[in-house]
Curated annotation (Swiss-Prot):
Residues the record lists as binding ATP: 18, 60-65, 256, 321, 393
Subcellular location, principal: cytoplasm
InterPro entries: AAA+_ATPase (IPR003593), ATP-dep_Clp_protease_ClpX (IPR050052), ATPase_AAA_core (IPR003959), Clp_ATPase_C (IPR019489), HslU (IPR004491), P-loop_NTPase (IPR027417)
PANTHER family noted in UniProt: ATP-DEPENDENT CLP PROTEASE ATP-BINDING SUBUNIT CLPX-LIKE, MITOCHONDRIAL-RELATED, ATP-DEPENDENT PROTEASE ATPASE SUBUNIT HSLU
Induction: By heat shock.
Keywords: ATP-binding, Chaperone, Cytoplasm, Nucleotide-binding, Stress response
Keyword Chaperone: yes
Subunit record text: A double ring-shaped homohexamer of HslV is capped on each side by a ring-shaped HslU homohexamer. The assembly of the HslU/HslV complex is dependent on binding of ATP.
GO biological process: protein unfolding; proteolysis involved in protein catabolic process
One Pfam match: AAA_2
Protein name as annotated: ATP-dependent protease ATPase subunit HslU
Function of the molecule: ATPase subunit of a proteasome-like degradation complex; this subunit has chaperone activity. The binding of ATP and its subsequent hydrolysis by HslU are essential for unfolding of protein substrates subsequently hydrolyzed by HslV. HslU recognizes the N-terminal part of its protein substrates and unfolds these before they are guided to HslV for hydrolysis.
GO CC, one annotated term: HslUV protease complex
Length: 443
């Protein structure tokens, strides 16, 4: 689990997301509170429940990006789901309990990677011994059994030294490795994913673990042997329990597009993919026990972060019980021209940096001037205002149109320097931006 302070979390998010300070602060505090809770005594820790967050803001302002970046920072089980993919229990489609099952699967993978990393040093030693056994087979007695030598032979030590120095990396050897499990693809109807995964694991376990002789270079064999030996050192039952504990104590669920499951107007039929989903979400958010293939998981202390544009619906259109379970409201602001300018230049891997790197592979040096950046930002903002406001995503559309000619001719422009200034942008975009009909379909 991450031990970063709220200030450090916000600072890390600032490297990728421009503006939206309130949302960053709320998420940072919620993440830090997970750590604070774990420092309490067990009795009080059980009483402290997470304060779930509802992020409200137009499309393209950074709601989903905050979730993506948070997943990398949290060092805790985190899953992002779309609210529109679920239906009420009993109808065709995924039920909301599958959120917790997927979160537990993600936790098992995360804990397994950590356990393998922890045992890597020992796994490297065992892998090294197996390769040395192939290069210099151990001595055998009259009954064909391997004799245990007190001290490794001089030849074995010499080969060990060469192996560690990489002198034998390209030498080919034949070695026995665990055969890949039998793959069985099962097509199941929506909502039956749990049964499908259980059937697949059952088929994979048929016939036990088989060994298969493979001819590989030593450097490739070493990688596979390290993975195999590390997996043997991991206790599966302990791993499952650690994963369930991680989900229950540190799990985070990010539910996107929650505004799309709000009830709109009066309808006579059953609303299985809107209000029905909200009702099914209630016990998860409030706290219940969900059955997964790894064991029973309690959701009492899982943090839920929901987000939605709420352009048609309003937060008050959510059923009152769900509103009460999302006590922290954060409003994200629409982006301005200056925000667009910062998005084009400040993030670590901004769009302009990406385009420059892509063109550099063809030997073309692209330079964006300040005036060019400003004009691109103005064009994107202008199109957003005159057509549909899709936030920062408009920058991708505008830049792709601007760079189309250079991208097409890049292989013929090798060694050239191209400067993209205000005049260049105006020449290529002004006609499109000014014509509302054209910009509606092209930008």
């Amino acid at each position: 689990m991450s031990e970063m302070t709220p200030r450090e979390i916000v600072s890390e998010l600032d490297k990728h997301i421009i503006g939206q300070d309130n949302a960053k602060r709320s998420v940072a505090i919620a993440l830090r509170n997970r750590w604070r809770r774990m420092q309490l005594n067990e009795e009080l820790r059980h009483e402290v429940t997470p304060k779930n967050i509802l992020m409200i803001g137009p499309t393209g302002v950074g709601k989903t990006e905050i979730a993506r970046r948070l997943a990398k920072l949290a060092n805790a089980p985190l899953i992002k789901v779309e609210a529109t993919k679920f239906t009420e229990v009993g109808y065709v489609g995924k039920e909301v309990d599958s959120i917790i099952r997927d979160l537990t699967d993600a936790a098992v993978k995360m804990v397994r990677v950590q356990a393998i990393e922890k045992n890597r040093y020992r796994a490297e030693e065992l892998a090294e011994e197996r390769i040395l056994d192939v290069l210099i087979p151990p001595a055998k007695n009259n009954w064909g059994q391997t004799e245990q030598q007190q001290e490794p032979s001089a030849a074995r030590q010499a080969f060990r030294k060469k192996l560690r120095e990489g002198q034998l990396d390209d030498k080919e050897i034949e070695i026995d490795l665990a055969a890949a499990p039998m793959g069985v693809e099962i097509m199941a109807p929506p909502g039956m994913e749990e049964m499908t995964s259980q059937l697949q694991s059952m088929f994979q376990n048929l016939g036990g673990q088989k060994q298969k002789a493979r001819k590989l270079k030593i450097k490739d064999a070493m990688k596979l042997l390290i993975e195999e030996e590390a997996a043997k050192l991991v206790n599966p039952e302990e791993l499952k329990q650690d994963a369930i504990d991680a989900v229950e104590q540190h799990g985070i669920v990010f539910i996107d597009e929650i505004d799309k499951i709000c009830k709109r107007g009066e309808s006579s039929g059953p609303d299985v993919s809107r209000e029905g989903v909200q009702r099914d979400l209630l016990p998860l958010v409030e706290g219940c026990t969900v059955s997964t293939k790894h064991g029973m998981v309690k959701t009492d202390h899982i943090l839920f972060i929901a987000s939605g544009a709420f352009q048609i619906a309003k937060p008050s259109d959510l059923i009152p019980e769900l509103q009460g379970r999302l006590p922290i409201r954060v409003e994200l602001q629409a982006l301005t021209t200056s925000d667009f300018e910062r998005i084009l230049t400040e993030p670590n891997a901004s769009i302009t940096v990406q385009y420059k790197a892509l063109m550099a592979t063809e030997g073309v040096n692209i330079e964006f001037t300040d005036s060019g950046i400003k004009r691109i930002a103005e064009a994107a903002w202008q199109v957003n205002e005159s057509t549909e406001n899709i936030g920062a995503r408009r920058l991708h559309t505008v830049l792709e149109r601007l760079m189309e000619e250079i991208s097409y001719d890049a292989s013929d422009l090798s060694g050239q320097n191209i400067t993209i200034d205000a005049d260049y942008v105006s020449k290529h975009l002004d006609a499109l931006v000014a014509d509302e009909d054209l910009s509606r379909f092209i930008l």
